[in-house]
C-alpha cells in the first residue's frame, strides 16, 4: 500500500529515469491534453462506481483518478506542496 506522497515520489522517479515500456512515461509524453482526457474519464468512472458498484470498485476507481491527477501535476511541474497550500 502506498500513500499519496509515496505515489507522487514513485511517479516522479519514473519520469526522471524513463524506464522502457513505462505507461507513466508514455502518458507524460502524450501531454497535458491527453492526461486531461484521462482525468475526466476516470472522474466519470468514480462517479459511476460510487453510484452503482461496491465500495471496493469505487476505491479502485478513485485510486486510478489519483494516479492520473498526479501525472497531470508532474506534467505541469506542480508539486505536492503547491497543492497542499490550497487545502
Curated annotation (Swiss-Prot):
Pathway in which the depicted protein is active: Amino-acid biosynthesis; L-histidine biosynthesis; L-histidine from 5-phospho-alpha-D-ribose 1-diphosphate: step 2/9
GO molecular function: ATP binding; phosphoribosyl-ATP diphosphatase activity
Catalysed reactions listed for this entry: 1-(5-phospho-beta-D-ribosyl)-ATP + H2O = 1-(5-phospho-beta-D-ribosyl)-5'-AMP + diphosphate + H(+)
Superkingdom in the source lineage: Bacteria
Keyword Cytoplasm: yes
GO process annotations (BP): L-histidine biosynthetic process
CDD domains: NTP-PPase_HisE
Region forming the signal peptide: none
Top EC class for this record: hydrolase
Keywords from the named record: Amino-acid biosynthesis, ATP-binding, Cytoplasm, Histidine biosynthesis, Hydrolase, Nucleotide-binding
UniProt GO cellular component terms: cytoplasm
EC number: 3.6.1.31
Pfam family, one: PRA-PH
HAMAP family the UniProt entry points to: HisE
Entry's family note: Belongs to the PRA-PH family.
Protein name as catalogued: Phosphoribosyl-ATP pyrophosphatase
Species this protein is from: Micrococcus luteus (strain ATCC 4698 / DSM 20030 / JCM 1464 / CCM 169 / CCUG 5858 / IAM 1056 / NBRC 3333 / NCIMB 9278 / NCTC 2665 / VKM Ac-2230) (Micrococcus lysodeikticus)
Amino acid at each position: 500500500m502506498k500513500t499519496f506522497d509515496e505515489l507522487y515520489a514513485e511517479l516522479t522517479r519514473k519520469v526522471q529515469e524513463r524506464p522502457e515500456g513505462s505507461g507513466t512515461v508514455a502518458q507524460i509524453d502524450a501531454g497535458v491534453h491527453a492526461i486531461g482526457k484521462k482525468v475526466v474519464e476516470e472522474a466519470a468512472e468514480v462517479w459511476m462506481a460510487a453510484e452503482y458498484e461496491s465500495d471496493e470498485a469505487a476505491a479502485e476507481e478513485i485510486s486510478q483518478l489519483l494516479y492520473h491527477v498526479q501525472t497531470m501535476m508532474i506534467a505541469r511541474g506542480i508539486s505536492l506542496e503547491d497543492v497542499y497550500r490550497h487545502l
